[in-house]
């Protein structure tokens, strides 16, 4: 996610993977063939027994919502994941694809996955949709057809135990995450950071995106009511879950490293 410029983090943990130095004023790294990725996602989901629902269509694109039922329904935790809301953040849909292909989901969890919320943005290699709207600022008074359709789908779903939103940050010095946990439930943040640091540097800056950070974790102290332009996470924390995480891979690193980081974080969160 784009934000204010930050000083280079001199305390960043040593890691063999280094920044590429391509991102100047925006994302200038590898891109994806989003149509091919979406086809692969649909194929992998069908192979692993997921059900698929199309909740929006535009041009030749379909917005898929995937669902996997738990082995046992009694007291099964419900988990929601999303990716690809910004068209210049390709690691998210690729991570969703790999998670589907590897199929390491907990068998007694109910999983809801929306793997690509802005496919047209990927064809343009830009953050916004075709109309220039940042979808991740459009979840309060929605103007875009994409956000309205997604919210309508979310309204039909049950409450989730927690959510994971997969993102990238073109300025980041390493992986970091946001935690929304207003009821102070057991945190998953530290275990995700511990898993990710094995495959990707962690951004240890004391200030990230203008907010205090500790060990790659941001715990915002403001409430959604204070902000007029809601990201998806604000809608989720107010309407669908009481605990959630926005995962930020550093997009000035090699694409495989970023995918590895997101996959490691998700697998750590689901290890219960």
Predicted regions and their residues:
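Structured catalytic-domain cores with a bias toward divalent-metal coordination
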Residues: 2-272
């Amino acid at each position: 996610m784009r934000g204010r410029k930050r000083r280079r983090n001199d305390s960043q943990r040593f890691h063999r993977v280094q920044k590429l130095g391509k991102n100047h004023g925006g994302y200038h790294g590898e891109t994806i063939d989003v149509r091919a990725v979406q086809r692969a996602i649909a194929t992998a989901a069908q192979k692993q027994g997921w059900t698929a629902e199309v909740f929006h269509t535009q041009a030749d694109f379909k917005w898929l919502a995937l669902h996997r039922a738990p082995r046992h329904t009694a007291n099964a935790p419900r988990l929601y994941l999303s990716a690809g809301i910004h068209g210049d953040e390709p690691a998210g849909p690729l991570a969703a694809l790999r998670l589907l292909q590897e199929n390491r989901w907990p068998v007694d969890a109910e999983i809801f996955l929306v793997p690509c919320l802005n496919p047209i943005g990927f064809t343009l290699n830009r953050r916004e949709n075709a109309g220039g709207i940042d979808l991740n600022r459009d979840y309060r008074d929605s103007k875009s057809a994409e956000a309205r359709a997604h919210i309508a789908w979310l309204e039909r779903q049950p409450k989730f135990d927690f959510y994971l939103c997969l993102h990238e940050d073109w300025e980041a010095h390493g992986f970091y995450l946001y935690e929304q946990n207003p009821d102070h439930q057991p945190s998953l943040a530290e275990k995700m950071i511990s898993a990710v640091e094995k495959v990707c540097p962690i951004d240890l800056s004391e200030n990230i995106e203008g907010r205090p950070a500790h060990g790659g974790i941001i715990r915002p102290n403001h409430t959604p009511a204070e902000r007029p332009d809601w990201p998806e996470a604000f809608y989720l924390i107010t309407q669908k879950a009481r605990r959630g995480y926005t995962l930020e891979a550093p997009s000035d690193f090699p694409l495989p490293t970023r995918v590895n980081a997101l996959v490691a974080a998700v697998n750590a969160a689901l290890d219960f």
